[in-house]
Amino acid sequence: MRHVFAAVMVAGLLTGGAHGQQTPSSPDSCTGLAQLALPDAKVVSAEAVPAGGFTPPPSLNPWTVGDPSFYKTVPAFCRVVVKATPSADSDIRIEVWMPAAGWSGRFRGQGNGGFAGEIDYRSMGAAVARGDATAGTDTGHSAGGTDASWALGHPEKVTDFGY
């Protein structure tokens, strides 16, 4: 899974330009990331999200979304959605967000708490607002922070979660 993160990040940063670049990257350079060939993974979508234009999906954990009005303050960014399947039982969702302009040169990997199986969109939005590129994952399952029922009978999902 680390290779998937690395491949998406390197490709995105190469198309986005140099450290601290103030010139916006082309929306085409973002959507072009949909053509990336990744081992055991597929880019589901790559889209240029306009400033204030992101709406988070419904959530099992309200803390991963926060106040929906917050997203109106998030600047434009490139959103890459990946599905990784290193095993037949794997279903890992990954998102990588890269600022459209003003990249700080920093990358922030966004984690989850407990057994949480959701992408922390609130923290990713805050990272992009600071000019950081960021990535998050659901660690291969969809569940609340105290629900581990997804692991019963699914040793590969446990491996995905622990990786």
Where in the sequence are the language-model features?
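Positively charged n-region of N-terminal signal peptides that target proteins for export
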Residues: 1-4
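Bacterial N-terminal signal peptides
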Residues: 6-16
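Catalytic-loop region of hydrolases
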Residues: 19-110, 119-122
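Cap/lid segment of the alpha/beta-hydrolase catalytic domain
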Residues: 104, 112-163
